[in-house]
Amino acid sequence: MKEKFFELKVLSRKSDVLKEFAFELGATCIEEIENGFILRDEDDLSNISWGLEEFAGRIGSDISTSLEIKDNIDWINEYKKGIKPVSSGKFYIRPSWEEQKDGFIDIIIDPALAFGSGHHESTSSCLNLISKYINLKECKIALDVGCGSGILSIALAKLGLAVDACDTDEQAVLSSTDNARKNGIKFNNIWTGSITDANGRYDVVVANIISDVILLLSKDLKMHVNNNGYLILSGILTKYKDRILQAFGDLELVWNITQNEWESFIFKNKDKNGK
């Protein structure tokens, strides 16, 4: 570990769009703050700062950036302090150093630097959709595509479903497995890869990933949903909403949640007899 690290603070009214672009530029550690976000890395973030400023100019967005060099020992503690519990639907998501809350299904997530802790709109919406529509009476087995920290997989498992999970990032698979262990959960199967490596069909398929990948995998996502099963899609910017609705128009749209510039959908794969 290096003695110093770079911290880039970005403020903008279009912080969600800029944050997504920051990931495309190679950012791995992002902390959300009011009206913006903070990037941290042991490598110089000057190029990412420049790229964000250029992108903001092209889309007509305001932006304010500040880059500092800090001691590594400080930012680890600051990062922990910045991660607070959050409730979404039936679930209460907390880091292990916080207490659980009565009346909620408890989920412990100690977030890795690149993966979710439940605070983002897309994750929160997924948890709300799972809370409202997914139950053991209808659903027995689920697949989480792009599992990240494993938060959605763990939520489904806490409801009693057998869960498969996958991610193209090996570190995400390790993070999900570790978080599952902390929650007393064991996945039915977890692998490094995507839905194209899945066998069989599921009562619930969840994909909280970027819009382009959802569209690319649209046929595979639909193919792996059982008759009368559910498909939950999230991580979608509003500008892609119409394209998503068109690509999945052969499924029944059950509900759509919009939070700021993020869209989440739950579809049902009605069987041929409409039962």
From Swiss-Prot:
GO terms for molecular function: protein-lysine N-methyltransferase activity. Pfam families: PrmA (PF06325). Its EC number is 2.1.1.-. GO terms for biological process: methylation. The keyword Ribonucleoprotein does not apply. Transmembrane segments: none annotated. S-adenosyl-L-methionine binds at residues 123, 146, 167, 208. GO terms for cellular component: cytoplasm. It is found in: Cytoplasm. Its main location: cytoplasm. Keywords: Cytoplasm, Methyltransferase, S-adenosyl-L-methionine, Transferase. It comes from the Bacteria. CDD domains: AdoMet_MTases. It catalyses: L-lysyl-[protein] + 3 S-adenosyl-L-methionine = N(6),N(6),N(6)-trimethyl-L-lysyl-[protein] + 3 S-adenosyl-L-homocysteine + 3 H(+). It is an enzyme of class 2 (transferase). Methylates ribosomal protein L11. Belongs to the methyltransferase superfamily. PrmA family. This is Ribosomal protein L11 methyltransferase. It comes from Campylobacter fetus subsp. fetus (strain 82-40).
